[in-house]
């Protein structure tokens, strides 16, 4: 097995040069050893008993022209999801107020678009401004962006932009053909250049190999800056999509993925995203032990079910977890230590 240094040696500074063999060596560690290393890294950057809560609202559901094999919002598949218009501003604000009242500190708005069109930018910008005025962090996922659009979203008060890599470059073509991996990387670059925080992760349990999970995490960690938020989604199978009936991912492998994400991106929030509704409390507890410190809160994630808010509150009480409330006014991304050194040198 490839040698991997003790946890104390891997927390000193963030890395952006991970190889697939190195990440696979992490995955292959004995389970308890891997969890120990992840928890050690986690404690160097976070209070291990605090979890940040976000709420995700679909502001434009269905009708997407892309062919993501996991997504019930694609027009290419016969699913229960039907195309709907953009939600009115007041409906979005009502959802945001309710989310804040239940303990969410970040409000995420998702639209089933291939890319943000100019005619939709102004109403979305208004939503961002009004949600931020409520004292919440703001996040959107709107697809690819055109020239100058990221800057205009930033000016409206946007804190985070979500754009996932989904999986490894090698497996990517099995999941989507209507958007390239490079398209995704270019969108992330636009977001960074505009001074917006990046939310970027992927989906596991789509029939990929462990090497693909390692490849996804390596590509995330090797970005010029680590994403501030890393959502780890476990596939929610929806009848009518090509991935309905995909083999279930072993629960311990999911925990290993969370632990490796924590080690590779030590200062990022690692979020348990889609798929929590089918996770046992024990599995979620293992994920928190492995370094997950954020969840999506609320009974629906875009179009898929999520645990009830009462259930999440009870789980937090049983585990002694506290809510983390970041400042609502999020500053521009601060360079990582190694970037400061290279810039000044």
From Swiss-Prot:
HAMAP family cross-referenced by the UniProt entry: BioB
GO MF term (any one): 2 iron, 2 sulfur cluster binding
UniProt keyword annotation of Cytoplasm present: no
Catalysis performed (reactions): (4R,5S)-dethiobiotin + (sulfur carrier)-SH + 2 reduced [2Fe-2S]-[ferredoxin] + 2 S-adenosyl-L-methionine = (sulfur carrier)-H + biotin + 2 5'-deoxyadenosine + 2 L-methionine + 2 oxidized [2Fe-2S]-[ferredoxin]
Role of this protein: Catalyzes the conversion of dethiobiotin (DTB) to biotin by the insertion of a sulfur atom into dethiobiotin via a radical-based mechanism.
E.C. code: 2.8.1.6
Subunit record text: Homodimer.
Binding site for [4Fe-4S] cluster: 64, 68, 71
Protein family per UniProt: Belongs to the radical SAM superfamily. Biotin synthase family.
GO biological process: biotin biosynthetic process
Descriptive protein name: Biotin synthase
Requisite cofactors: [4Fe-4S] cluster; [2Fe-2S] cluster
Binding sites annotated in the UniProt record for [2Fe-2S] cluster: 108, 139, 199, 271
PROSITE patterns listed in its UniProt record: RADICAL_SAM
């Amino acid at each position: 097995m490839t040698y991997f240094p003790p946890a104390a040696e891997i927390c000193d500074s963030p890395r952006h040069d991970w190889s697939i063999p190195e990440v696979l060596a992490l995955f292959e560690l004995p389970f308890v050893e891997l969890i120990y290393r992840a928890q050690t890294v986690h404690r160097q950057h976070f209070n291990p008993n605090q979890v940040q809560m976000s709420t995700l609202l679909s502001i434009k559901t269905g009708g997407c022209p892309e062919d993501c094999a996991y997504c019930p919002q694609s027009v290419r598949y016969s699913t229960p999801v039907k195309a709907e218009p953009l939600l009115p501003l007041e409906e979005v604000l009502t959802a945001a107020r309710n989310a804040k009242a239940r303990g969410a500190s970040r409000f995420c708005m998702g639209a089933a678009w291939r890319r943000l069109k100019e005619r939709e930018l102004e109403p979305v910008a208004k939503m961002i401004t009004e949600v931020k005025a409520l004292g919440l962090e703001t996040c959107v996922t709107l697809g690819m962006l055109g020239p100058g659009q990221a800057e205009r979203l930033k000016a409206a008060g946007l804190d985070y932009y979500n754009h996932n890599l989904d999986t490894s470059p090698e497996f990517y073509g099995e999941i989507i053909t209507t958007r390239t991996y490079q398209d995704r990387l270019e969108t992330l670059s636009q977001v960074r250049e505009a001074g917006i925080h990046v939310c970027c992760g992927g989906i596991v349990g789509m029939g990929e190999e462990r090497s693909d999970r390692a490849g996804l995490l390596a590509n995330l960690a090797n970005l010029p800056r680590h994403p501030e938020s890393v959502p780890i989604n476990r596939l929610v199978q929806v009848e009518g999509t090509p991935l309905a009936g995909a083999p279930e991912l072993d629960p311990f492998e999911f925990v290993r993925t969370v632990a490796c994400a924590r080690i590779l991106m030590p200062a990022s929030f690692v979020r348990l995203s889609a798929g929590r509704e089918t996770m046992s409390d024990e599995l979620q507890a293992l994920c928190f032990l492995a370094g997950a410190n954020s969840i999506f809160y609320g009974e629906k994630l875009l179009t898929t079910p999520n645990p009830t808010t009462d259930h999440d509150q009870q789980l937090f009480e049983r585990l002694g977890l506290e809510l983390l409330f970041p400042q609502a006014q999020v500053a521009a991304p601060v360079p990582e230590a190694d970037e400061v050194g290279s810039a000044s040198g």
